[in-house]
Amino acid sequence: MHGHRASASAIHPDYPVTHRESTWRRATLIVQGSTATVDDTLRPAVPARGLQAAEIAREIATEIATAVAEVVTTVTVLEIDVTTAETTAAMTVETTAETAAAHVHHPVARGHRTAEMIVTAETTAGTTAGTTVAMIGTGVEVPRHVGQARDVLQPHRPRTSAATREERVNPEKQKEDKLAERAAKLLEWKKRKEAERLAQEKAGTPGSGASPAGSVPSTPAVAATPPPREAKPTVAKSKVPKPATEKVKQKQPEKSSFKLDESAAARPLIAKPAGKPVAIAAASKYHHIDYKCSNQLTQTDGAAAAATTKANGNIGSFGLKTKSTAEEDISSKALLDDEIDTGKRKLQALPVFATHDEPETTAGVEDDAAMSDIGTDDDETNAQLQAKLQSRRAELSHDQAADKDTNMEEVPTADNTGDQMDVDDNAGAEEDDVDPLDAFMADLSVPQQPSRAAPQGETMFNDDLEPEQTAVEGEDLLALRAAKKKKKEVPTINHEKVEYEPFRKDFYTEPAEITQMSAEDVADLRHELDGIKVKPDDVPRPVTKWAQMGLLQQTMDVFTRVGYARPTAIQAQAIPIAESGRDLIGVAKTGSGKTLAFGIPMIRHVLDQRPLKPADGPIGLILAPTRELSLQIVNELKPFLNASGITIKCAYGGQPISDQIAMIKRGGIHILCATAGRLIDLLQSNSGRVLSFRRITYVVLDEADRMFDMGFEPQVMKILASIRPDRQTILFSATFPKTMAALARKALDKPAEVIIGGRSKVAPEITQHITIVPPSYEKKIAKLLHHLGQTFSDDENAQVLIFTERQETAEDLLSKLFKAKYFAVNTIHGAKDQTDRNEAINEFKQGLLNILIATSVAARGLDVPGLALVYNFDCPTHLEDYVHRCGRTGRAGNKGLAVTLIENPGQERFAVHIVKALKESGAEVPDDLQAMANAFHEKVKSGTEKYYNVGFKGKGLDELDASRALDKKREKRALKLGDDDASDDEPDLPKLKKPEASGPGVAKSTNGDAAAEPVQDEPAWKKLLLGKIVVNKTERAETGKPTTAKERAMAAARKIDGNLSRKGTVHAGQPIDNKGPDAGLYHSTLEINDFPQKARWAVTNRTNVAKILDATGVSITTKGNFYGPGKEPGETDLPKLYILVEGDTEGVVTQAMLELTRLLTDATVAAEEAASTRGPTGRYSVMS
């Protein structure tokens, strides 16, 4: 049957191999009396070209070769014509018992695809006689030669057979009966086999005890010829049918003796000889067989499976190899373990689709499974199976008792190999229902391991991939963050070991007309230029024209283009000093042109040095206190620097540091303008390999007093210490207190001081109005609205800058102005993102905004030429702050107005600074303001008050670090964390006094010292994080009204409890508003009202909530109202903001609560760290 596989070219010579259509064939064998009809249909069919339809039908009938010997003797093939769709009886083929087969598997290739044939045989009584499914994998290009088609076809996944009539009626019942019957027969058969083996052992049979290892040849490729059987010679069989009783006797030894003889055990396993392909091996290689069939079909199974073809046999007209009568008889009567044709036979594991209730495979199945693969075409597989079988035999020879689970036995040694196996007729009648192949297949309930040594996968469950839902202790969480957080330090450089390039500082040559001036003329000139004061006296003289400074022509052209006709006072004196190479301290009023005073000399300084290499750092460095000021410096200097081919870049916080690192690595930056904090970050990036200070020779500190006041003095000093000592350093500011001057001189080398118009002075172009108001927030807002109305009535396009002391006040004023119909309003303060701040400033400069509300962060560097009004809603706390605020208006010679509100009583101390500023600027002092200042002086004389004239004092970071360390220890105490990792330099907190017991019978201490410090209360949000998660079962609403007195009392109590809970906070697990029909079985609550805003956002934003919902399947609802600090809900108000988590099980609710708690903890700690690292924003601390 399997000796030939017809190729597409052999059947259809004109059919192209590249055809991609599917040509599946379904052939149905229908039994009617003694005739079987095969209905062969092609879909889509391929017409026969060059061949007759009768020849195709004969080939199909011959290859299918299906018939049950007892019923079917003739097969009729119906051919469907492709073009006319007519059915004709193409061929009738007779069959006999020897050629009939219950299970037929033969692939027929059709074009580029392969064929599928389903053959069904039915008896005259309507019962199922057998079902055969033949499937071949698709997608194989079939060669044009018949001999090559045999080795090209690929295996396909097995397909179950067609259902029989009874199975279609009740398939489940039929399967259960078959499984039960097979299991019972299998158990009985195993018992008999075990009894036989024990009987042989007792009789002293050496078959199982002898070790065959020594007789196994080393080369398994050479097959040993099995000796012929003496008692059973090969006899040619005729085609005459035999009685049923004779056939039964011939088949009993096949089913009952499933053994290996001694010669098979002693010789190596061999592969299939090349000359004779085996039918059952071919079928096993390409597809699996469904063995769920009736007993009548099973009896013919052994004969059909043993049928073989000869390689040297006759060739039919269609290339099919015919058999001789003798070979058919021999192959049909051979046993599975018989010596005849043992080398040609293939055994392979054939899985059965068993149910889960079948018994587990015993240890002996491992050997059976190994034996089932003997003789396959894969040499590597055969070698592995042979080694496995030999190892098993060696174990049997050493330990016979350990082989009780093996179901296969070895036959006696060579003395009995030639004897014919006896047939027990009585036993045959008893074992008629048990087939060894069926029993073997039933044992294969567990899939066997693959024969190849391939990498094995590992079973992974979804639960193994999930992180452990273990609550993280607060100590571990804070310890982890403390370990990650390191104090920013700039590495110290030993300049004595570094060899720096020499550079030139002095580029200034005094013009002849300036040299010829007398000392009196120079003094008069400095007096005309806003009273310039210089120290020492030997500094270069001031100039009056740009041409007298020795500038480049490109720079002169830019001055002409931007319209700067002559230098300002600070520029006239500072530029000659800077070009001469001396360090400089410049103090001038705001808007006087300090930026160009240090920027113009930088051009000559940079161009005089050699060009930059890719790895070189900048030559000039400008430090600014705020981001806005750094951007303004870059924008103002860029036209002049670009004209000379000099590149300037800006680096400040609020932007991704990765972008700025990439900018620096690209190189080519001559001047870098940066804030102190971001410059520290750049110095520490990649262990200091990002930014190099070797080429820096020109350093500028703009608004130096403000920079030191913000706590950057240690960082600034370390930055300056990392730069070569012979650098040129220039400091500029609008104010310069004496304490600040002492700190600045540490970083400068014999600096020259230039002071324009006094140390802290408001420009005379600015009109100052002081308004005294009572200490009422509403009255101050009324005054503000009154002044705004007057300003916009005079000029509707006017712009107003309002200063506040706190960020909260700025945001509140924004909402008040919105209500007053002022819509072109925005705010800037330290809590806003840098992008929002830049956008607001740009819109204000472009005139899109009429009102800008700001804290002191915008007082430095904000330059709006057309600003008409500066409004100090909160009074400045010291003189320097007042000067800087007022300096935002009246810039570049324009007129301006500054209005200041001061509260009386309450702000008498600030009146002293304002009176001093008015007197120094030559403005008139109001009488009521002078009275407030005099009253404060009287209080100072009486000792009830003292002066506070701190200005912008440099507090540094020592005090700030100490304050942060104190806050950290206080937080640890609140969280009840240990102090194991506490360092020695951390400040100690006063110990908390344990609360004393009180009540009847408890004596209270009368010692006055005992009433020491009060106990510090923990914040509410910390108590929530430390508390345990409580999950309650949801209370369902009652179906009816309470009838008994007890039920009415319980309902009233629950109502009262609900009302009380609405007044206060929501405790963890408190059941609130979750008694509806859609409420979960379990619920828990988490109050988030008192957490920081970032923490509340972390547990309420859609992204985080969606992740928790997907992971747990719970329902998360945000309920209640938000109440600010110090506010509590009333009796009829909703409770504080909280989260309600509902779920079907307690576990999922707990898991969701753990994740929410984690998000709250992370966001809260991040908010605390951000607040501590940012430091004070918009407020000034008064130091005594």
Curated annotation (Swiss-Prot):
Name of protein: Pre-mRNA-processing ATP-dependent RNA helicase PRP5
Species of the source: Phaeosphaeria nodorum (strain SN15 / ATCC MYA-4574 / FGSC 10173)
Top-level enzyme category: hydrolase
Biased composition (Basic and acidic residues): 164-178, 244-262, 392-407
Listed InterPro entries: DEAD/DEAH_box_helicase_dom, Helicase_ATP-bd, Helicase_C-like, P-loop_NTPase, PRP5/DDX46/KHDC4_KH, RNA-helicase_DEAD-box_CS, RNA_helicase_DEAD_Q_motif
Catalyzed chemical reaction(s): ATP + H2O = ADP + phosphate + H(+)
Pfam families given in the database record: DEAD (PF00270), Helicase_C (PF00271), KH_12 (PF23469)
GO molecular function: ATP binding; ATP hydrolysis activity; nucleic acid binding; RNA helicase activity
Gene3D superfamilies recorded: P-loop containing nucleotide triphosphate hydrolases
Compositional bias segments (type: Low complexity): 203-224
Enzyme Commission number: 3.6.4.13
Cited SUPFAM superfamilies: P-loop containing nucleoside triphosphate hydrolases
Record keywords: ATP-binding, Helicase, Hydrolase, mRNA processing, mRNA splicing, Nucleotide-binding, Nucleus
UniProt short sequence motif DEAD box, positions renumbered to this chain: 702-705
Recorded family membership: Belongs to the DEAD box helicase family. DDX46/PRP5 subfamily.
Record-linked PROSITE patterns: DEAD_ATP_HELICASE, HELICASE_ATP_BIND_1, HELICASE_CTER, Q_MOTIF
An annotated GO cellular component: nucleus
Organism superkingdom: Eukaryota
